[in-house]
Structures are given as structure tokens and as C-alpha cells.
Amino acid sequence: MHDHEIIHVNEYDRRKFLKISGIAAGLGLVNSIASHEISFAYPVAKLPGFSAFSKSVRVLKSEKYYLVESDGIPSHQMMVGIRSWQQQVPTTQPYSGTNAWSIPITPVISKNPMSAKDHFLRGAIAIAVNGIPIFNALNNRGDDALLAGELDNWGGHCGRADDYHYHIAPTHLQSVVGSKVPIAYALDGFPIYGEKEVDGKKVVNLDSFNGHFDSKKNYHYHATKTYPYINGGFKGTVAEIEGQVDPQSLTKAFRPAGEPLRGAVITGFSRSGQSTFDLTYSVNGLENHVKYSATLKEVSMQFIDSTGNTRSEVYSRK
């Protein structure tokens, strides 16, 4: 389970922006205003890998960062295969405007690289080219999320804010983007490639961060089938504030924290359009459903147990 109530600052002072705009206006309005302003302030940019997802992801370029905008919902299937579930579900997220993901345009090798084994147990450490954040392979308890059965068949699950994210490399994206471009970018700015080099050769001599220099002395990370799966920390310079990379996009829980549901296995997940979903899970062989619709303003949920009993809840997102 993750607590994602985090603050993101690009080249705006977000706290000052919130004060000027009026906190009572709510996150949705603030993001709408910010997105409008930032769209005019910064041009659309090209960054290898992202173009394959141009219908759902936009990349802008500021003075210091590539700014990645998405709604946090991937086009691929989700949730199926999870065996350790906190009863969180994927919902749309406000990753736009001043809340977009920030990738440094010019990454710099750090004099003191930091390992993800004892840093960055909160928040994202990378962003995939489909606009989905990637968290530390270790969850916030320090356990390997994959080995704990917390991840779906695509390497992701949902956090405290019902936000979908990966904890291992989304190597399945290579079937979309190919092997010659990154599948993700670490938040220090260095690219993350798949399990082979761009020329198809075997990856060798990775450092403890899952990266190495190429023949042109350019640094990059690689995905691996074993820990750390993705960048195992940062070879590049980053700022760490309260256990996470800064800047960091903001998500906010809209309902009470889910509890572990012992014996639950997620067996199905379907969607109708962009905002209506049906999650199927079994407990002791009995089928249950969570049917819901989610926008940035409201989430409406129906919990249907194996006997057909239904409980409905509606949450406002502020």
C-alpha cells in the first residue's frame, strides 16, 4: 500500500499558484488552469518512445524538463494476476499542467549516486513511455513487490490513491515501441532500455543501478528479469525529499484506505470506454466484482459479492 499525497513543483511555485488561484477552487480546477497555462507556455516535444502513445500521452519541453502528461490509465489490460490485494483499483489521475511528470532534459552523472535499496521507497523513480509511473521495485515496507504477489501480469498495481503504477520494467512495451528506443526514462533523465542492447546484443557489465555506458560514453539503464528489474537507484543527479524524488507528480486519496483481502485473487478486468471498469476477483473460488466509473471529479463504485449483494458508494475528488 502506498501513500501518494505528494507535492510536485516544475518551474512554477505550486504552493504560490494554489494560493493565488484560491485553494477552495479544488485540485481539478487548479490543474485545468495550470494545464491551459502550461500548454501555451511550453511547446510540444519529441522524446524517443513516447510517440507510439501520442493518443494518450503528451510531452512538452520547458527550460529544464520534458513534461509528460497522461491520465494514468494504460491501454493494456491491468490487475489480473494479483494475489496480494489492498482493494485499490485503477482510476484516472491528473498528470497534466504543473502536475506533469518531469524528466531532466540534460541528465548529469552524480558524484554520489543513490541506491534504491535504502532510498526512494515512496513515489516514482521513472516514467514509462506510455505515461505510467514506475516505482521502486521494493514497496514502502522494503519488500520486493513482485515476489510478494502484489503485481499484475504487466508489472503494476494500484496505490493508496487508486493510482496505477509499475514496480518492475514494463518490458511488454517493447512489442509496441521496438527494441531501439527506450521503454521508460528514469527521473534523473537517463533512458531505460529493454533486456537487450539496441543492436540486439546481450546486455553485459551492468552496474548496481542496472546501467552502463555505451561506446559513445552515454549512460543508460536496462530492464532485467531479476532485481532491481528497472533502475536500481540513480546514477544521475536527483533531489530526494521525504523519501522520494523531487519534483514528483501529485496524487490524492479520495476514499479510506483499502485493507488486505486475504485469499483474494484478481481474475478479470474489463473496461467500457475510458472511464467505466469491472474488476473481478475470487475468494475461496467464489466470484466477486467491483464495478465503477471514475473521472477526475467523481468516482462511483458498486461492490457485488458472490451472493449478489450490492453496496454502492460515491466519492467526490477534490
Each PLM stretch: what is its role?
Residues 113-180:
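Extracellular-facing segments of soluble proteins and assemblies that are Gly/Ser/Thr-biased and enriched
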